[in-house]
Amino acid sequence: MSFVTENPWLMVLTIFIINVCYVTFLTMRTILTLKGYRYIAASVSFLEVLVYIVGLGLVMSNLDHIQNIIAYAFGFSIGIIVGMKIEEKLALGYTVVNVTSAEYELDLPNELRNLGYGVTHYAAFGRDGSRMVMQILTPRKYERKLMDTIKNLDPKAFIIAYEPRNIHGGFWTKGIRRRKLKDYEPEELESVVEHEIQSK
């Protein structure tokens, strides 16, 4: 440890890395707690405190130089970004996608059901007349694929996505057809839908 304290630039690097790790765990733990993943959040908090105890003493005792302070602040900001990126990659939980479309003849609900999504749809009325509204629940890791699919089927559709707090009953308790969602690509919609219709 004395080797680190005697080398100014190595100290800068150490402070930066320790703070990135600490704040990454802190950010992930906060997000996981808000999403309701209590036990995973508790495990992450263990690592967070471990880094805090082992590393922060070194960090705080060497903030007497401007470069160390800058490294500490920069590591903090990078740690937040890294933590959020990791959570995005994990894509925990589900997303509700609400779609409003004027194109009844496209039969979007059945097109999406053929691809493995659970769709609830109903008629609604706006300023310009009748519209079809669809509510679709999907795992977060398939959110982008779903939105690309909808845009390919109906480029003018109005789409809103948000995260539900609690889920109970319905299509999802019976088991989502994840294999279908995983296997297709939005660019290959026509052939996939034709295959599903023919197989029925």
Curated annotation (Swiss-Prot):
GO CC aspect terms: plasma membrane
Key words of the record: Cell membrane, Membrane, Transmembrane, Transmembrane helix
Membrane-spanning parts: 8-28, 40-60, 66-86
Subcellular location field: Cell membrane
Lipid bilayer topology: Multi-pass membrane protein
Main location: membrane
InterPro entries: DUF2179, DUF5698, UPF0316
CDD domains for the chain: YitT_C_like_1 (cd16381)
Pfam families: DUF2179, DUF5698
Family designation: Belongs to the UPF0316 family.
Entry-linked PANTHER family: UPF0316 PROTEIN YEBE
HAMAP family: UPF0316
Name under which the protein is recorded: UPF0316 protein SAOUHSC_02131
